[in-house]
Design a protein with these regions (language model features):
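Divalent metal-dependent catalytic cores for phosphoryl transfer on phosphate-bearing substrates
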Residues: 104, 109, 115, 132-260, ...
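Residue-level marker of positions within ordered structural domains that often coincide
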Residues: 6, 125, 188
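Non-catalytic terminal regions of proteins
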Residues: 255-285
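Acidic/His-rich, divalent-metal-binding segments that scaffold phosphate/diphosphate chemistry
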Residues: 15-168
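Hydrophobic alpha-helical targeting segments used for export or membrane insertion
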Residues: 4-13
Length: 285
C-alpha cells in the first residue's frame, strides 16, 4: 500500500497543473493577488452576482452543459469555424493559470491570471473614481468588479501548462482569444444579465461591431443560438476596456524576461527569486 501511495504522490508531482499551482503559491506577488481577487469577489454586494462570480473563480471553465460540447459539428458550422476545439470540461485552476501565453503573451507564468486581474481591477476602480470626481458619473461598482474578475477566467482552461512548463499559443474564436468568447458563454450559462455580458465583452474593444459577434459566438457555444446584442453602450464597458489596456507594457516586460531567463519550469523558479518581470523592467536601462 505504501508503494501505491508513493506512486500517486509521484504522479501528482509530475502533473503540470499541480506543479503550476505550487509555483503560483510560491510567487508572493501572485499569491497575494489571488487572495485579493477572492476577497473582491466575496465583497460584491448583490448576493446572486457574488455567488456567480465566486463560482466562476472556483470553477473557471466552460460548464459541461454547454450546447457545443454535445453538438461540435453543428457548432463549427454555425460559427463558420471548422477548426473549433473546446477545452476539456472541468479542467482549470484560477490560481495556477497564466495571464497569457507563456512565451509571447503577458503575465505568462503560473499565477499570472491573478496578477493581471487584480491590476485591471485596481485600474478600473481608479478610472471610475476619476469619472465620478470629474464628470459626476456614478459607476455600477458591483457590475464593474464582476466584469473584470470574470473576463479572464477561462484562461485557466485555454492555456493549460504542459509537462515542459510551456503554455500556448491560444486559439481564437470569432477573432478574439478563445478564453474571451468562452468566458462569455460561461456567463450566459450562469445566467448573467445581458448588460453585464456586454461590459465583460468590452474588455478587448468597446466597439459594438466587435462586441456583438463575440456575444453571438458565445451564445452559439452556450445554447446553440445567436443572441440579440444589447444596444446600450455604458460607461462601465468603456472603463473595463481602458483598464484592460496595459498589454503593450506587460507583454514587453514579460518578453524581455523570457529572453533572459531559463526555459520551462526553471524560468518560474527564477521568477520566484527575481520578484516579478515588471519590477526588473523598471530597473532596465
Amino acid at each position: 500500500m505504501a508503494n501505491i501511495a508513493l506512486l500517486f504522490m509521484l504522479a501528482a508531482a509530475q502533473d503540470p497543473a499541480v506543479r503550476a499551482r505550487e509555483v503560483a503559491a510560491k510567487l508572493p506577488f501572485a499569491y497575494r493577488a489571488y487572495l485579493e481577487v477572492r476577497r473582491e469577489a466575496g465583497a460584491i454586494g448583490d448576493p446572486a452576482l457574488r455567488a456567480a462570480v465566486e463560482a466562476q473563480v472556483l470553477a473557471p471553465w466552460l460548464p459541461p452543459q454547454a450546447w457545443a460540447y454535445g453538438h461540435p459539428t453543428e457548432a463549427r458550422k454555425l460559427l463558420g469555424d471548422p477548426k473549433l476545439e473546446l477545452p476539456p470540461p472541468r479542467k482549470g485552476d484560477f490560481l495556477a493559470a497564466p495571464g497569457g501565453a507563456c512565451e509571447d503573451g503577458h503575465h505568462g507564468y503560473p499565477g499570472g491570471l491573478s496578477v493581471h486581474t487584480l491590476a485591471t481591477l485596481r485600474q478600473a476602480r481608479a478610472l471610475a473614481e476619476s469619472y465620478r470626481q470629474v464628470y459626476g458619473v456614478e459607476v455600477h461598482t458591483d457590475q464593474l468588479t464582476a466584469a473584470v474578475i470574470w473576463q479572464g477566467t477561462l484562461t485557466a482552461a485555454t492555456l493549460p501548462f504542459r509537462a515542459d512548463g510551456s503554455c500556448g499559443p491560444e486559439a481564437e474564436i470569432a477573432g478574439a482569444p478563445a478564453h474571451h468568447v468562452l468566458g462569455l458563454a460561461a456567463g450566459i450559462l450562469r445566467h448573467l444579465p445581458d448588460d453585464l455580458l456586454y461590459v465583460i465583452a468590452a474588455a478587448p474593444s468597446p466597439d459594438p461591431n466587435r462586441i456583438c459577434p463575440w456575444l453571438s459566438a458565445a451564445s452559439v457555444i452556450a445554447e446553440g443560438r445567436t443572441m440579440t446584442c444589447p444596444q446600450r453602450q455604458t460607461v462601465e464597458a468603456f472603463i473595463h476596456h481602458f483598464a484592460d489596456s496595459d498589454a503593450p507594457l506587460t507583454t514587453l516586460s514579460w518578453s524581455r524576461y523570457v529572453a533572459r531567463a531559463p526555459k520551462g519550469w526553471a524560468r518560474y523558479d527564477a521568477l520566484i527569486q527575481d520578484g516579478n518581470d515588471l519590477l526588473l523592467f523598471s530597473r532596465s536601462p
